[in-house]
Amino acid sequence: MEALGKYFIFLGKLFVNRETFGTYFKLIIDECVAIGINSIFLVSLVSFFMGAVTTIQTAYNLVSPLIPDYVISLVVRDMTILELAPTIIGVIYAGKVGSSMASGLGTMRISEQIDALEVMGINSTSYLVLPKILGSLLMYPLLVILAGLLSIVGGYLAGEFTGVITPTEYIYGIRFEFNEYMVTFALIKSFVFAFLVASISSFKGYYTTGGAVEVGKASTAAVTQSVIAILTADYLLAQLLLQ
C-alpha cells in the first residue's frame, strides 16, 4: 500500500510547476520517435506472424464440414481486435519500451542528473516523465492499429499460401457481422495500457537507488509490474465494457 500511495503522489507531481508548451513539445516529439517509430519493426514482425499462426491454428481446429470456411477469418478478426493486438503487443511494449524508460531514468537517478534538475528549480518528475506518458498515449494506439491490420494481412497471406481458406472466403469472414464497437474497445484498452506501462516504468526508474545492479533490478521490476497491470486491466475492462 505504501508503494501504491507513493505511485499516486508521483502521478500528482506530473502536473505541478510544469514547463512551457514549447519545451514539452520537443520532448514529446523525441519520445514519440523513441517509443513509436523505433518499435514499428518489432510490432510489425510479431503482428504479421501472429495473424498467420492464428489463421493456420484456427483452420486446424475447425475441421467440421458443417462449419463454413469464413469462420476462420471471423475468429482471426475478433481475436486480433479484441485481444491479440492490444494485449500481446502491450506485453511486448512493456518489455521493449518499459524497460528502456526504467533504465534510462534509473541511470539518470544514480548519476545525480535528476538531483541537478531539482537544484535548478525544475520539476524533474514533470520534465522527464510527462513527455514519456504523453508520447506513449500518442504512439501506442497507433501501434495497436498497425498490429491489427498486419495481423489480418498475415492471416490472409497464410490462408492463401497454405490453401486453408480462399481469399474470397477470408475477406467475407472479415466483413461478416462486423461490430465497430470492437475497434472502440481495443482503442480504449490501448490508451489504458499505454498509460500503465509508461507511468509504472517511469515510477520504478525514477525512484531507483544504489548503482548499476539496482538499475537492472528496477528495469526488470518495471516490466514485471507493467505486464501484471496490463493483464489485470485487460480483465477489468472486459468485465466492464463487454457485458
Where are the predicted features?
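Start (N-cap) of specific transmembrane helices in multi-pass transporter permeases
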Residues: 123-144, 218
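Short, membrane-interfacial amphipathic segments enriched in basic
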Residues: 1-26, 204, 209
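Hydrophobic alpha-helical transmembrane segments of multi-pass membrane transport proteins
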Residues: 72-115, 200
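Active-site cofactor/substrate anionic-group-binding motifs, chiefly glycine-
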Residues: 36-88, 92
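Short cytoplasmic-facing helical segments at TM-TM junctions of multi-pass membrane proteins
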Residues: 105-130, 212-215
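Membrane-interface helix starts
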Residues: 20-45
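Membrane-interfacial helix-loop-helix connectors in multipass membrane proteins
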Residues: 57-81, 148-191, 199-218, 240-243
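Hydrophobic alpha-helical transmembrane segments of multipass membrane transporters and ion channels
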Residues: 37-49, 85-90, 138-147, 184, ...
